[in-house]
């Protein structure tokens, strides 16, 4: 039986959040791009979640090829959101993301590349720093013909590497409206075509575990992972 399963998307409206609940998701990480982040938008989404019995958390996706800028953005938002994603594709950004345990997810490492965006060295970095690799269904679906086959191949290659080196993996619908939302059973069914069922289950549960970890780290008595003030 699955533990809590959270989708990763850009759903902020009440109808969309109700659809996520109806489809069977326990929670949602609604991410905004760093260029247009709005506290009001995510606060309203969290309110809709409370009213409809589904957990809604805040995510931030960083879209930048400037490593110094990325550091500044992560520092600015780390305590304001539950998950930080960095859009990959550029091999230097892929490495930068996987070297930092202050980020949570390397998003689309294969973006605009002829290869999968990862190798053994980078995957080991993700394992060491517990940075997840994202499988973005929206990126897969929006591509066609050869490009879709290339993204699917990248998924398969990255899954093989991540399983070998115990690097966490998340899967996201990436939906920005109700038509892009997928039911968790359908998402797991897709994963079952790529990996064994137990590994698919592990991937489905990873997003909620990241959120729980970040919520724990925000507690005032937690100085660092494994070190807490006990009164």
Curated annotation (Swiss-Prot):
Organism: Methanococcus vannielii (strain ATCC 35089 / DSM 1224 / JCM 13029 / OCM 148 / SB)
Lineage start: Archaea, Methanobacteriati, Methanobacteriota, Methanomada group, Methanococci
GO molecular function, one term: ribonuclease P activity
NCBIfam families: RNaseP3Mthcoc (NF046108)
Catalytic activity: Endonucleolytic cleavage of RNA, removing 5'-extranucleotides from tRNA precursor
UniProt-recorded name of the protein: Ribonuclease P protein component 3
GO BP terms, alphabetized: tRNA 5'-leader removal
Locations listed in the record: Cytoplasm
Subunit structure: Consists of a catalytic RNA component and at least 4-5 protein subunits.
Family statement drawn from the similarity comment of this UniProt entry: Belongs to the eukaryotic/archaeal RNase P protein component 3 family.
Keyword line: Cytoplasm, Endonuclease, Hydrolase, Nuclease, tRNA processing
Function: Part of ribonuclease P, a protein complex that generates mature tRNA molecules by cleaving their 5'-ends.
EC number: 3.1.26.5
One GO CC annotation: ribonuclease P complex
Name of the gene: rnp3
């Amino acid at each position: 039986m699955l533990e809590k399963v959270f989708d990763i998307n850009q759903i902020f409206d009440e109808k969309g959040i109700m659809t996520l609940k109806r489809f069977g998701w326990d929670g949602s990480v609604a991410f905004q791009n760093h260029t247009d982040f709005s506290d009001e938008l995510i606060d309203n989404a969290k309110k809709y979640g409370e009213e409809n019995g589904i957990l809604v958390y805040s995510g931030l996706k960083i879209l930048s090829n400037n490593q110094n800028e990325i550091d500044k953005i992560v520092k600015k938002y780390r305590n304001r959101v539950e998950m930080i994603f960095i859009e990959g594709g550029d091999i230097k950004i892929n490495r930068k993301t996987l070297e930092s345990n202050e980020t949570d997810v390397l998003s689309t490492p294969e973006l605009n590349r002829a290869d999968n965006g990862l190798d053994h060295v980078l995957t080991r970095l993700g394992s060491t720093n517990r940075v997840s690799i994202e499988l973005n269904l929206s990126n897969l679906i929006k591509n066609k013909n050869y490009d879709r086959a290339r993204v699917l191949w990248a998924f398969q290659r990255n899954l093989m590497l991540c399983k070998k080196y115990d690097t966490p993996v998340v899967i996201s619908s990436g939906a920005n409206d109700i038509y892009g939302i997928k039911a968790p059973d359908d998402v797991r069914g897709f994963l079952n075509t790529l990996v064994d069922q137990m590994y698919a289950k592990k991937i489905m549960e990873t997003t909620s575990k990241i959120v729980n970890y970040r919520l724990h780290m925000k507690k005032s008595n937690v100085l660092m992972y494994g070190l807490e003030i006990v009164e």
